Amino acid sequence: MSARIIDGKVISAELRARVAAEVTRIKTDHGITPGLAVVLVGADPASEVYVRSKHKQTQEAGMASFEHRLPADVPQAELLALIAKLNADPTVHGILVQLPLPKGLDSNAVIDAIDPAKDVDGLNPVNAGRLASGLFALTPCTPLGCIIMAKQVHASLEGMNAIVVGRSNLVGKPLVQLLLNENATVTIAHSRSRDLPALCRQADLVFAAVGKPEMIRGDWIKPGATVIDVGINRTPSPDGGKDKLVGDVAFAEAKEVAGAITPVPGGVGLMTVACLLVNTVRAASAIHGLPKPAV
């Protein structure tokens, strides 16, 4: 058996098209243009690529895109002052500070300073608490993308056994909350969990977000399970050429056992920016007291 490939390119394109349609509707019906402000501190090459992608996709969706670039040695107070300015700006509905920040800056203080109503990364403790309480919240983009991809295979996740391997604030913990809100039965595990292979073999849904290249092997997967691989790891090429990207799952092994699986690259990573656009539209609608958009 060879697993169905859950194609992030196709799914993210469909999601961006739905976002663009909602943006057009909000503009036409209410005269509001959703706006996303991205703050980049320093010049990390990977962050530069990601910010360019966000800017391009935001504009393609018909939204306003604002970029704010600060030097790596910017004082904390200056960064917080910029966030306060964006919090008060009525044309900005979403604020994202590109992480990680350079050394010397307090990421937690920066995240705490973002207005929860504009926190499109979903990392402010207010949004984390609302999510845990089952209330409306802006949700971290990668976990949201994981749920959307799982629902491409299963119309409902209710009653399914799910395992989340990884416990980060960015992916693992919010993903657990989203799965609980879908009425799945959830196990959260990590690299130090006892007998992790046995835990994985019990799961109908495996979400790998541990940050270790190909840690989850094919014989850890229950036959027919759905595997969502969040990992993006750069590893040396065996032939000495360009480094290659691999996930947290041994893809070649797992696809012979799983019922459906996301590839790396071409899977969850493409959903992250698409879900950022979703959060920006949701934030704009909530700020202006509009009904929740159809995305």
Swiss-Prot record:
GO terms for biological process: L-histidine biosynthetic process; methionine biosynthetic process; purine nucleotide biosynthetic process; tetrahydrofolate interconversion. Keywords: Amino-acid biosynthesis, Histidine biosynthesis, Hydrolase, Methionine biosynthesis, Multifunctional enzyme, NADP, One-carbon metabolism, Oxidoreductase, Purine biosynthesis. One of its GO terms (molecular function) is methenyltetrahydrofolate cyclohydrolase activity. Pathway: One-carbon metabolism; tetrahydrofolate interconversion. Pfam families: THF_DHG_CYH, THF_DHG_CYH_C. Its EC number is 1.5.1.5, 3.5.4.9. It comes from the Bacteria. One of its GO terms (cellular component) is cytosol. It catalyses: (6R)-5,10-methylene-5,6,7,8-tetrahydrofolate + NADP(+) = (6R)-5,10-methenyltetrahydrofolate + NADPH; (6R)-5,10-methenyltetrahydrofolate + H2O = (6R)-10-formyltetrahydrofolate + H(+). NADP(+) binds at G166, R167, S168, S191, I232. Belongs to the tetrahydrofolate dehydrogenase/cyclohydrolase family. Catalyzes the oxidation of 5,10-methylenetetrahydrofolate to 5,10-methenyltetrahydrofolate and then the hydrolysis of 5,10-methenyltetrahydrofolate to 10-formyltetrahydrofolate. Homodimer. This is Bifunctional protein FolD. It comes from Rhodopseudomonas palustris (strain BisA53). The gene is folD.
